[in-house]
Design a protein with these regions (language model features):
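Structured soluble/peripheral alpha/beta segments that form catalytic or ligand/cofactor-binding pockets
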Residues: 1-273
């Protein structure tokens, strides 16, 4: 969790994406669930939204818990993004193993669950940046392949804010199992077809521009078949020297049939581990 000055000026987010199949129509959709925390040391009994006109008028810095969940667009469907905000006073956290809960939204290393229900009236408030709809998820999580970012994400470089935003690709190949219910329609999520991804970002600000790409479903151009035990993850970052931003870099890992190939400035002399 965020500590020290980062607790007053920092964020942490846990991202998950995966596929689910509707058993009645066989429709396949790609879903996402994100848990995030912003400026926890400034929290009160109400979520403080930085984009809200009243809070801006009084000079209050944003501080809240947020759940963002929904479904990615498909041809003929614009997708759905739901956001719900919660006060820091509702947060419950345990360590070893890490566990986090606010309201009915639960995060742990091997399970995520929760629900969002946004009415049309609430969605009309532009400051909330949300669509209307409902989303329920209950999923087991198995993170099979992690991206190794080396020393650049250790405690020292985090403390001196060597990056604007740190990344840990803790599950660039993740298996999900469970169900999601999108606007009353149930989708089943199975490990073999979930093609899941999970990661964590933390820091003082989001990278701008934001660059992130990942895939757990790679197809060989040579054979036309799926590459087993393979995944690709790319993340952009902006390193600093003496608090001055340097040229933007990328962090990348390709896992090819079980073998990891890494490319980032944290491992300047090797491309593979």
């Amino acid at each position: 969790m965020l500590r020290g000055s980062d607790a007053k000026r920092g964020y942490m987010r846990w991202w998950h994406s995966f596929q689910g199949i509707c058993p009645t129509t066989q429709e396949t959709r790609t879903f996402f669930v994100e848990y995030s925390i912003l400026n926890p040391a400034l929290g009160t009994s109400q979520p403080i939204l930085g984009q809200h006109p009243d809070y801006k008028r009084h000079g209050l810095k944003p501080s809240y818990l947020c759940i963002k969940a929904g479904v990615f667009p498909e041809p003929g469907d614009s997708g759905l993004q739901l956001r719900a905000y919660y006060p820091l006073t509702s947060l419950q956290v345990a360590q070893d193993p890490f566990y986090m809960q606010f309201e009915d939204c639960v995060y742990s290393e091997n399970r995520i669950s929760g629900s969002i229900d946004i009415s049309d009236e609430v969605a009309r408030h532009r400051s909330l940046m949300t669509d209307a709809g409902s989303f329920i998820w209950d999923l087991e999580v198995h993170k099979a392949v992690a991206c190794h970012t080396g020393y650049i994400a250790n405690a020292f470089f985090t403390a001196v804010h060597a990056l604007e935003s740190f990344w840990h690709g803790e599950g660039i190949r993740t298996f999900f199992r469970g169900t999601v219910i999108l606007n009353g329609v149930t989708y089943e999520v199975t490990p073999e077809t979930s093609y899941g991804y999970a990661d964590k970002h933390w820091g003082r600000s989001y990278n701008q521009p934001w660059l992130q790409f990942a895939s757990g479903h790679l197809i060989s151009e040579k054979t036309g078949r799926e590459l087993k035990h393979s995944a690709l993850a790319i993340d952009g970052c902006c390193p600093k020297f003496l608090f001055f931003p340097m040229r933007r870099r990328i962090l990348m890992q390709l896992t090819y049939t079980g073998e990891d190939f890494e490319y980032h400035f944290g491992r300047p002399l090797t491309l593979s581990r």
